[in-house]
A protein has these predicted regions:
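N-terminal accessory beta-strand-rich subdomains and adjacent acidic, glycine-rich linkers
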Residues: 10-12, 21-468, 855
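Active-site-proximal substrate-binding groove within the catalytic cores of carbohydrate-active enzymes
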Residues: 77, 82-89, 351, 360-397, ...
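Aromatic-lined carbohydrate-binding/catalytic grooves of carbohydrate-active enzymes
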Residues: 471-559, 564-630, 657-661
Length: 865
């Protein structure tokens, strides 16, 4: 009996030890893990000195002081209004932070005039977490009240704003004092003058219920007497604000803010920088958004030109277009962060913003705005004249706090994150140099491309100043679906198996047919090749899908593609993990909403409820959003294991396509911090020796990519927008090869239209193929891929590639330097090597520049031929 007892005790001790080890591993591996913090970037502010304007022997802006100068520009400051002016030495044009004649604007009301004259506007919630509709504007609440100071920076100026209405009926006599502070002041005043101490005590009454003292009256005689008592101890305005804040009385401290804005001139650019670490909030206010430089370079009613916005591939909003009754343009950079609001519905689809840029082009200036820092928090806003003023303008705003509206007991409440995101809100305004034909969006695209090349974010495929025309076949981009999970039954039990839609051998047969059709360069994105197929298990391990073939067959396929100038990329998802993924702990490793604490998930949009968490009957469709905290564990492990598989590269399904934060209350990770982590992981994958292909291609990923698929080639047709432009393509052409969405994935395919659009955009044809018929995926999570059978699309693929190749083979490494529309429906695209391509979209012939173009055709001129 004793022996049995010992055994039981021993087993219990062993079980406790095992449980302890499991708990130790769990907490160490998940709760106490802090390795991700090493990826966060730190930034330092430039040193400042006492403000002193520069000597200006040749003043260019009357009434303004010179504060900085470069070879191209001069920066001026109005010391009375904080208005800024940039004088372009090359053209003689002057650009103001806001129009000088703002007060004469007959269309703008006083509220909008205050907005126009403000360099920054602060949107906030009050102490009850309710949004205050009218923001605090730097002109109305700082400049007009003379609450601003200047400090000099190297080649710039620092402006410090104190935004608030500090006027009080009682002056600096506090309305409220905490019990402890009242006793302290009473003792000090009595020691200095006993009669004044008695006066002080007579005019403050204790509110025992609320725990503080209140001034008996705010009448002038009482205020004078108490002020005289306070003067005996040298009471100051700083003491006044400190006492109000410490009193604990609701509303005692007036709402106010402090903000610092650095304005620096660098070569051909003006840099505006507002560090959030210098944003201070008082009176229970909680800043959730900041708008900067709303009217910088704004154009009036008599000017001609347009605003450039990063809507999909890019689009134009023409000045004075008569659309003042439509909704203003606003889009979030890199799309909306799902974790920022807790809204789980999607009522419309928008082309995402891939580039943190905007611009304004008029007859006398072309300005590109680049959001250098804080881009993950930014939205681009634009508006035309006659809506709120006589001006057309575009500007960025930044969301610094996430908030959710929660429904509780028939009511609702707003929950807002306690801390602002720590980041620099930095905008670089690049002033384009005037060309013979004036300014255009082509110049802005060139400015952005040059800027990125100088930073190392883009690397030219050919020589930087390529003049000679060379010929190189373009690639055909091919998504090949390999393993697809499908539901099967065994003895009545349901389980998931893998259906091999395209084996490695069958992929070779597809390539054979393409070669017979003349397509000799193919870049393959192989999907569903490992860890259970398309909706794969956690990618920290790599197990090839055996039904597709062996590793040697996969590597042989890669060798074959590389031999003809192509490539084989193997697809992987890092930021989204399927609900059925093995090796992933969704309840712990996923991002969470700040307000509700729920795990963040994403599926398809339910057409009835519009919720984007629908499974449509296939649970593998629903994905967890992986917390940035744990992202590096998967990327580092995957990169290490991929070195044992000899293929060209890695295709990133989501790492270059979307960006999300983590609202977990005890360990929040902002979207700005998430970007630091993602960029670090792109670097890890890049250093693995594999080439990288990205889907979507957000701008922060360009530095690491060889190829981009599903690049934005369209724009969202907002009411205020007038037309789309291939701005995205104009920036990256000649540095990264790219394609749009798979041509056979949509429902409005036209072979002729596809050819013309590819030729115009410089994008390469892209298809998605399966060897088996698409009907075999009808009852799977990929049932939206209903038109993938290669035999149905082989003729189109070869024909489209042949036509597009005949035009674009001359410009594979050249920059797209100009795009114009010389006639309705006719586009002219000029490349850096002198090649000019005309595209006629019209259903009838056209004559342009002395050339005859057939209906729905293109014409390529190489070296004038």
């Amino acid at each position: 009996m004793k022996s049995l007892k010992k055994w039981i005790i021993g087993l219990l001790i062993l079980a406790a030890l095992i449980a302890g080890l499991i708990l130790f591993y769990y907490f160490r591996h998940y709760n106490f893990y802090r390795g991700y913090q090493s990826f966060f970037q730190t930034r330092t502010a430039p040193e400042d000195t006492d403000f002193k304007a520069l000597r200006d022997p040749d003043p260019a802006v009357e009434g303004f002081s010179l504060v900085a100068e470069s070879d191209s520009l001069k920066l001026y400051l109005d010391e009375k209004t904080t208005n800024l002016a940039v004088y372009d030495k090359r053209s003689g044009a002057v650009t103001y932070a806001y129009p000088k004649d703002t007060d004469a604007d007959g269309l703008a009301n006083p509220t909008n005039k205050n907005t126009m004259k403000s360099c920054l506007s602060i949107y906030y919630m009050n102490s009850s977490n309710n949004q205050v509709t009218e923001p605090y504007k730097s002109y109305q609440y700082a400049v007009a009240k003379n609450q601003f100071t200047f400090r000099s920076l190297e080649n710039g100026v620092r402006i410090h704003f104190e935004l608030g209405d500090f006027e009080s009926k009682t002056g600096i006599v506090p309305l409220y004092l905490s019990n402890a502070r009242f006793e302290e002041l009473h003792e000090q005043i009595t020691a200095a003058d006993a009669s004044q101490g008695k006066t002080f005590a007579n005019y403050y009454h204790e509110n025992a219920e609320k725990g503080y003292y209140e001034l008996a009256s705010s009448g002038p005689s009482v205020v004078r007497k108490v002020m005289k008592a306070l003067e005996t101890v040298g009471y100051t305005q700083e003491d006044y604000y400190a006492d109000l804040e410490s009193s604990g009385a609701e509303g005692a401290v007036p709402v106010s803010f402090e903000a610092t804005m650095d304005v620096i001139l660098e070569d051909d650019a003006l840099v505006i920088d507002v560090p959030t670490s210098e944003l201070k909030e008082y009176g229970g206010a909680q800043i959730y958004q900041v708008a900067l430089m709303n009217y910088f370079g704004a154009a009036g009613l008599e000017e001609e030109g347009y605003l450039v916005v990063p809507n999909g591939s890019g689009s134009l909003i023409r000045f004075n277009n008569g659309k003042e009754y439509t909704q203003s343009y606003m889009q979030s950079v890199y799309g909306i962060d799902q974790l920022s609001s807790g809204n789980l519905t999607q009522t419309e689809y928008q082309q995402p913003v891939r580039m943190p840029v905007f611009g304004i082009v008029s007859e006398d200036r072309g300005i590109l705005g680049v959001i250098e820092e804080g881009d993950t928090l930014a939205a681009v806003n634009a508006c035309v004249s006659k809506k709120v003023s006589s001006y057309n303008y575009v500007y960025p705003s930044f969301t610094l706090r996430t908030y959710e509206t929660l429904s509780m007991n028939g009511g609702s409440m707003t929950v807002i994150s306690p801390e602002m995101v720590q980041a620099d809100l930095r905008i670089r305004y690049i002033f384009a140099e005037k060309q013979e034909d004036g300014y255009s969006y082509s110049d802005l695209a060139g400015c952005y491309r040059d800027y990125l090349i100088d930073k190392g974010d883009l690397t030219p495929l050919g020589e930087a100043e390529q003049k000679a025309v060379t010929e190189q076949d373009i690639p055909l981009y091919l998504d090949i679906l390999g393993g697809v999970k499908e539901t099967e039954f065994f003895l009545g039990a349901q389980y998931l198996s893998v259906n091999p839609m395209t084996t490695y051998k069958e992929a070779g047969e597809i390539l054979d047919e393409l070669e017979q059709g003349g397509v000799d360069r193919v870049v393959v994105n192989y999907q569903g090749w490992f860890n259970g197929g398309y909706y794969h298990n956690a990618p920290d391990n790599i197990n090839l899908v055996g039904k597709l073939g062996s590793q040697k067959e996969l590597e042989a396929l890669s060798d074959r593609l590389e031999a003809s100038g192509g490539a084989l990329y193997t697809d992987v998802a890092f930021q989204k993990q399927s609900r059925i993924a093995k090796g992933y702990l969704g309840s712990v490793e996923s991002s969470k909403y700040y307000g509700s604490g729920h795990v963040a998930m994403e599926g398809r949009v339910n057409p009835t409820t519009f919720r984007f968490t629908a499974t449509m009957g296939y649970k593998e469709i629903l994905n967890y959003l992986v917390s940035p905290k744990f992202l590096n564990r998967y990327t580092e492990s995957f990169a290490q294991k991929m070195q044992k598989i000899d293929v060209t590269g890695i295709s990133l399904r989501d790492l270059t396509d979307e960006l999300h934060s983590d609202g977990k209350r005890t360990e929040m990770i902002s979207r700005e911090q998430a970007l630091d982590i993602v960029e670090a992981q792109l670097g890890v994958l890049d250093e693995s020796g594999k080439q990288l292909m990205g889907s979507g291609g957000n701008a922060y990923s360009w530095r690491y990519l060889e190829d981009i698929i599903n690049a934005p080639t369209e724009y969202s047709d907002f009411f205020m927008v007038d037309e789309g432009i291939p701005f995205y393509e104009m920036v990256i052409h000649g540095s990264i090869n790219y394609s749009g969405l798979a041509l056979n994935s949509g429902d409005n395919y036209s072979r002729k239209k596809a050819i013309l659009e590819c030729v115009e955009e410089g994008s390469y044809p892209h298809f998605v193929f399966t060897y088996k018929e698409a009907t075999e995926m009808k009852y799977t999570g990929l049932n939206d891929h209903y038109s993938t059978w290669y035999e149905n699309w082989m003729e189109d693929a070869t024909e489209v590639w042949t036509e597009v190749n005949s035009a674009l083979k001359y410009v594979t490494d050249a920059y797209m330097v100009n795009r114009t529309e010389p006639a309705d429906g006719v586009i002219r695209v000029t490349y850096s090597n002198g090649v000019v391509i005309y595209i006629n979209y019209n259903g009838e012939p056209a004559s342009v520049d002395g050339l005859s173009l057939e209906a729905e055709s293109y014409l390529v001129l190489t070296a004038g031929k």
